[in-house]
Each structure stands twice: as structure tokens, then as C-alpha cells.
């Protein structure tokens, strides 16, 4: 074998066979002596299947960084049984490559059922319906950090395995919650999501928006900085006929994104967003902790937050004359990820969610695990009101149940359900805090709202409202 500057010994080539349902058999490798091009052949049975490939030397993956120049029937849904090929031109040296005496190259080809989607989905926004799948972030061709496309022209989504996981959403006990004027809106209650979903690894960037053919003014311009000053109406459309669960306006951000990818992207629901922001469930992922499992130690400047997020404590520089200059947002991915692998869930920009915002007392009905109020939240569903009717036709509190027309009255006496569009045009929820927020407003459990359309008044002049997208796995 040979690549640029390297000579490999063909006799050391081997191939592994990984059986699954569907199955892959007869994996072969060969290399063209002149071009150095490697051809990986395999036989697929039980199509359709999502096929992924990994290249290993000495039993260790070389990583996606070295697989940028790879093409063929992999990382996508393969619909036909039989022989398939993958072509790879290895043009970068890796750690083991120069040691020809010990060198041993292996291709591991995996096939998964079409309904068992891999953890990483990548949509190439430059082309129609160009969607790829990978086993993990480390498998991304060219490398997540080495290849700027993943934050400019491609959209990287990570699967959140939350189906049937019961967890406690909200908090009234952690630092930054107790004593806030709106702390009751964080009142703890149990939630169970009924579907897994993909969520953007990063906040949606300005370059990604431009790739969709859309432009808007940003407070802090930069290709890999997050979109800011983003109105809910720009995301979905301003007419009530475009409110969830209807399809968005074709000319909106989500309308353009759906048309380009063929996938039903949307904003995350609050429950989807918070589950991911908490870093999952379990020890160190509940009250009083950031999404990376470190404790919240302050409502103002928390060192555990400044280590993982662009926030007020690190978003300003002091000039020689004593004045301050705002650095604003950071390039997405500038700080470490949380425990589920997501970046900038705290700080940078506040992130829009689908849900309606009804003020500081949304949870005044004391929804707590102790009173048996367990909620099944359909992934992607938002604000169904469950409770006793009051004068303004609003329930006393919200459960994330199922926002669909004609949702029936509850079996319990005095219980009422209605969809979120009781309040068309109302404020929508934001989550996560921004570059200009203290620790109390960056907590995974903090909730607040902002006008669906207004982006040019008040704090929005500072460029604090952005978004990331979600995709429910049906």
C-alpha cells in the first residue's frame, strides 16, 4: 500500500466481519499500487440498513480525521442487498502508519436496521437530501475540529437516548432558583419522554444560516459564531397557521432547512432541551449541578461555569481607562462539552424552544413527584395545559403532554387539557442563558420567555437570542 509519503505492505491487510441484523459478510480490502486508493468491498444481507465503517490499525481506530477522502456505500441508508464498495484515499499519516513492521490494517463494517439509527447524523446543507450517519463524533471524516465544514456548511446532530427514561424536570432548591421572582416556574415535576431525538451538537451558526440562503443582522458577526437576534417568527413563521404542530412557513429558517434536508427539523421542546442540558440523569445531573456534573457554587460568578461556557464572568475585557468592552458570543464549541457531548448548552446565546411562555407561575399547581403527577411528554410536543380552568381559560399549571388538536378532557374530575395555541402570538420560552448572564440564568433548569417576534428592542440589541435544532426519531 502507499499514500503520500508512506509505504504500506499489502501482506498485512486483513478484514473483519461484523454480524448484525441486517448482516455484513465477505469484507475485503485491496489497494491500487499506482494511486494508493483502497477499495473496501462487502456483501450486505437484510437491507435496508444503515452501514458504517471504521479503519483500524493494530486493533485501534485511526479516527475520522484520516478518512476525509472516502466515498461509496457507507454512512447512509443502503437499500439493496448484495455487493457494495467503499473507496478511501489515505492521504494523511497516522500514529501507526510509518511502522510497517507492526502495521496491520483492518476495515470494520457495521450494518444496523433502518430503525436503529446511529448516534451521529450529519446534514450537508449545500445539497438536497444529503444526510450521513456515523457511529460517533470521532468517526466524522476529516475530524470534527480539523474540518470547519461541521460548523459552517454541515449540521451535526447527536442522538439523545431518552425514550422511557423518567426524570425530574425543574428545580426550586438549587442556588439561583430559590428567591428568584420567577422561581415557581421551575417547580420540580417528573417527565417521561416517549421518543429518542437528535439535537444539534452546536448552536446554529451564522455560516449555516447563510448556506441555507438566508441572512439577517447579527450583533456579533462571525461564520462560526451562533446566530443571534433570532425571532421565533423567523424560525417558524409569523402567521398562526404555521404554529406547531403545523409545518413551518416555507420561507422561514425551519422551512428552508426541511426543504433542503428532507427531514422534519424543529426547535426542541423544553423537555428535550433540558434533558440534554442536564447531561442526562443520575448522580451529579440533578439539582445543583451543571451539565458536566460539576456543582453550581454561586448565583453570580461560578468558576465551574466559566470553565465551560461564555458567560458574564468571561465575556468582558477591562480597558486601560477602566471601561469594559463586550466580547459577546464565542465561536461555537470554544468550551468543553457537557456529559452528553453537547456544546454551549449554558451561556453563549439563549436558545429558543417551541413552548409558549405564560409567566412566572407556570407551575403554581405544585407539580411534584410526591403528589404522583407523572407526565408523559411526547418528544417535540409542547405546552398542553392540565389543571382547573380559571377565568382566562388557562390551566393552573402546565404539563408537557401532547400538543394536538382535540386533546380530550382528562378522566379525573376537574381536569382539563388544551393545546398551547390558546395564546396565539404569545411569548415563547428561552433556555440556557447567554454571554451576558450570571450563573443563575445559565443553569440547565432556568426558564424564561421572550416575544415571538421582537428582536430589536430591549436586551435583544445585545444579541442574546439564538437556537439549535432538534429532530424527533419517529
Each predicted region: which residue ranges?
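Structural beta-strand segments of beta-rich domains
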Residues: 36-40
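Short solvent-exposed strand-capping/beta-turn motif centered on an Asx-Ser/Thr pair
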Residues: 45-47
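Short, compositionally biased P/S/T/A/G/V-rich stretches that sit at domain boundaries
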Residues: 20-33
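Solvent-exposed serine/threonine-rich low-complexity stretches and specific carbohydrate-binding patches
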Residues: 63-78
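Short, compositionally biased
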Residues: 6, 12, 19-22, 43, ...
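Functional-site microenvironments in short loops/helix caps that host divalent-cation chemistry
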Residues: 221, 229-444
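Positively charged n-region of N-terminal signal peptides that target proteins for export
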Residues: 1-4
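Signal that preferentially marks extracellular ectodomain short beta-strand elements
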Residues: 74-75, 83-99
